[in-house]
Regions:
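Secondary-structure edge/capping motif, primarily at the C-terminal ends of alpha-helices
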Residues: 20, 24-28, 53, 77-84, ...
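Solvent-exposed, non-transmembrane amphipathic alpha-helical segments
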Residues: 26, 30-33, 87-90, 94, ...
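Intrinsically disordered, low-complexity regions
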Residues: 34-35, 58, 69, 111
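Generic structural signal of hydrophobic/aromatic residues within well-ordered alpha-helices
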Residues: 13, 42, 70-73, 105
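Short terminal alpha-helical segments
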Residues: 1-50
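Amphipathic protein-protein interaction modules
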Residues: 48-101
Length: 111
C-alpha cells in the first residue's frame, strides 16, 4: 500500500486555505451553489490533514498551532446552523474571523 505524498497533501491544504482566506465576494464567486457549505469541507480538510502533515514533519509547530486555531474556530461554527448560509458568509463576523485565521495559517505555512 502506498501512502499519500505528504507534499501533495500540503499543496491541497494550501489551496484550501487560500480559498478560505479570500473575501466573501470572492468565495461566493468561486464556490457557486452553496459557498458556506463548501467551506465546511475545507474545515474537514484542515482537521484531517494538519495532524498527518505534522506527523510527517512537513509542517512545523507554529503552522500546526495556527491550523489548530482555524479548526477550533470552525468547530464552534458547526454549533450554529445559521452560519452555514451564503448570506451569513457575507455578514456574520465569525466568517471574517475564519478568513483571518486561514490567512494566519497560510502565513505560517510560508505562503
Amino acid at each position: 500500500m502506498t501512502l499519500p505524498d505528504p507534499h501533495a497533501r500540503l499543496r491541497t491544504l494550501r489551496e484550501s486555505l487560500e480559498l478560505a482566506a479570500r473575501p466573501a465576494a470572492e468565495q461566493l464567486a468561486a464556490l457557486r451553489g452553496g459557498a458556506a457549505a463548501q467551506l465546511r469541507l475545507i474545515h474537514e480538510d484542515v482537521a484531517h490533514l494538519a495532524p498527518e502533515l505534522r506527523a510527517a514533519g512537513v509542517i512545523d509547530a507554529e503552522a500546526f498551532r495556527r491550523l489548530g486555531a482555524f479548526d477550533r474556530h470552525h468547530e464552534t461554527l458547526l454549533e450554529d446552523e445559521r452560519v452555514w448560509t451564503d448570506e451569513a458568509l457575507e455578514q456574520d463576523p465569525r466568517w471574517e474571523e475564519s478568513r483571518s485565521l486561514a490567512a494566519a495559517a497560510l502565513s505560517a505555512l510560508g505562503q
